[in-house]
Regions:
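Conserved acetyl-CoA-binding loop-helix of GNAT-fold acetyltransferases
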Residues: 85, 91-104, 127-131
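C-terminal "cap" of GNAT-fold acetyltransferases
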Residues: 2-3, 11, 112-152
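Acetyl-CoA-dependent GNAT
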Residues: 3-75, 81, 138-142
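Conserved GNAT acetyl-CoA-binding A-motif
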Residues: 99, 106-117
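Residue-level recognition of the GNAT/N-acetyltransferase active site
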Residues: 81, 86, 119
Length: 152
């Protein structure tokens, strides 16, 4: 079994089709319909970075990432916003390979860090992230909280 990870080429019709198929599978877990314009809008964002993992050349998972910037450290930051491994490929190392591929891209391009969000009840994901040395912000930045305000 060979696992590979590649960065999505936003101009590639093939990558767009593969991503759309995986993204529909991802959204089905949330009972959400895919707005037909989402992928085009996503691929048009200059700060979008997408990654796809393959097992023996079959699409197996994806990550939607967004680039931001640390004003404190004057370096780019990569945020993993959506992360999914297809049901049929879970438990086979795809998630680890996908995260390692993102990390390698970030190291090669001088990013400061990688951030992500995970639900408290997603034990499998938290175990994966911990195994690769990700840690809760509160461990690193005691006394800080992340807040949000939905606008619609």
């Amino acid at each position: 079994m060979k696992i590979t990870t590649s960065r999505i080429e936003t101009e590639s019709i093939g990558d767009k089709g593969i991503f759309e198929t995986l993204f529909r599978e991802y959204l089905s877990g949330f009972s959400v319909e895919l707005d037909p314009s989402v992928i085009a809008q996503l691929f048009a964002l200059p700060y979008f970075h997408g990654f796809i993992s393959f097992v023996d050349n079959k699409p197996a998972g994806f990550a939607v990432c967004f680039e931001s910037f640390s004003t404190y450290r004057a370096q780019r930051v990569m945020n993993i916003h959506d992360f999914m491994v297809s049901d049929s490929f879970r438990g086979k190392g795809v998630g680890k390979a996908l995260l390692n591929g993102i990390e390698q891209y970030c190291r090669d391009n001088d990013y400061l860090k990688i951030t992500l969000e995970v639900s408290n009840d997603n034990v499998a994901a938290k175990n994966l992230y911990s195994s690769l040395d990700y840690e809760d912000y509160r461990v690193v930045l005691k006394g800080q909280q992340h807040w949000q305000k939905y606008l619609n």
